[in-house]
Regions:
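Active-site histidine-anchored catalytic micro-motif
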Residues: 37-89, 116-230
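Bacterial N-terminal signal peptides
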Residues: 10-26
Length: 383
């Protein structure tokens, strides 16, 4: 055990040494600020199901839709075979109805990649649509696209392996919620879904904005993970009735017609059950980095704000709750990440909490503000 203690100290030393790397050439700051009136093209990859595995994905989807500057080109539903039985397109159709959008969905590859450079071409045609959609969207976009991935990263890596040049010229960032920041003995759930896809992503050299799910093992956050907890009452206390219905439908694994359910009156007993629950979250307001949003104090409250929306333009006057710092990482064949410059290492941007004491309550407040805007006038323009 003493030997393991030394190894852990060395591992953590790599991390802190890596954090002092100077930001140099070629990398933009996290989340290019959205210009007034200009949408940010986004491909969203998620392991969203109905009935759910974990309804945190429903909160993330709703938060994404609450940011009208994000032009969601399409949603790739992870783990295609499971999608046939438990379709994530159901909550997407509900969010489309609530916001007036018309975002398409496609299902992704069915089985894990066999190697980091696997193109997934041996999988059947019904599961190729996700990879094909990613490639087609990148080709068609006049501006670089942001890709957010919440799940296995399988379809993104297979698409990259088919068209690496296209990715290098037309991907603005890959915002990846996956992995463990500091414990080499712990394999995080999303990595376990497809270890070779994770290896492929971390070796790709793409502009990866890495958001580890944990830092220090299961349910731990030492400052480089996005994990936090919230009560449903705090998140949804000001949400519109159709948004409450959306979450009741998800949490209670409803089987009735999903769009009609949104317009039914909220039943007090079901709302009480919803509000009594709590949720583990990882994404939500963090998704705003794709358009340059930051979780900042605006007067007497914390919001997920676009640049300039709080009277600040960045710099010393604006103190975001979290951000990203550039690090050098390498990853072995088992998906274990090491820090520091070495042969085969690549630069990524690593998530960091800048105010640990305030992180959880302020993430609750900022996410609640976004969710409160859904279903209300001006919350999201049709796209």
């Amino acid at each position: 055990m003493a030997e393991w203690g030394v190894m852990r100290a060395i591992w953590q030393g790599w991390l802190f040494a890596a954090m002092v790397l100077a930001v140099g050439g070629g990398w933009a700051t996290a989340g290019a600020p959205a210009e007034a009136g200009r949408a940010v093209p986004v491909i969203y990859c998620t392991d969203l199901f109905h009935p759910h595995d974990d309804p945190d994905d429903h909160f993330d989807l709703a938060t994404l839709y609450a940011m009208p500057e994000l032009d969601i080109k399409g949603i790739i539903l992870d783990q295609g075979r499971k999608q046939l039985e438990r379709p994530g397109r159901i909550p997407v159709s509900q969010m489309n109805r609530i916001t007036g959008r018309n975002v398409p969905t496609v299902i992704g590859l069915a089985t894990p990649l066999k190697s980091p450079d696997d193109k997934g071409l041996d999988q059947t045609p019904e599961f190729q649509r996700g990879v094909e959609f990613i490639v087609q969207t990148l080709r068609a976009s006049a501006t670089p696209v942001c890709i957010a991935t919440l799940g296995s990263v399988r379809d993104v890596v297979a698409a990259f392996n088919r068209e690496p040049g296209l990715f290098r010229t037309n991907v603005a960032m890959v915002l990846a919620f996956i992995g463990e920041a500091s414990d080499p003995e712990y394999q995080e759930y999303n990595v376990g879904l497809d270890p070779q896809a994770f290896v492929g992503l971390m070796r790709s050299g793409l502009p990866v904005y890495w958001v580890p799910c944990f830092d220090g093992g299961l349910w731990q956050n030492r400052g480089h993970a996005s994990f936090w907890r919230a009560s449903h009452r705090a998140l949804l206390g000001k949400a519109a009735p159709e948004v409450i219905q959306y979450f009741i439908y998800a949490l209670e694994k409803e089987g009735s017609e999903p769009l009609a359910f949104l317009s039914r009156p909220v039943e007090p007993e079901r709302q009480a059950r919803l509000f009594a629950d709590t949720r583990n979250l990882w994404c939500a307001a963090v998704l705003g980095v794709m358009s340059g949003r930051e979780v900042v104090r605006d007067g007497g409250k914390w919001t997920c704000a676009l640049p300039g929306s709080d009277g600040q333009t960045g710099g010393a006057g604006r103190k975001p709750l979290f951000g990203f710092s550039e690090v050098e990482v390498s990853v072995d064949d088992a998906g274990v990440v090491g820090y520091g410059k070495r042969p085969g290492s690549h630069r990524v941007r690593l998530f960091e909490v800048r105010d640990p004491a305030q992180y959880e309550p302020r993430m609750v407040e900022a996410t609640a503000g976004l969710l409160a805007s859904l279903g209300r006038k001006g919350a999201a323009a049709s796209r």
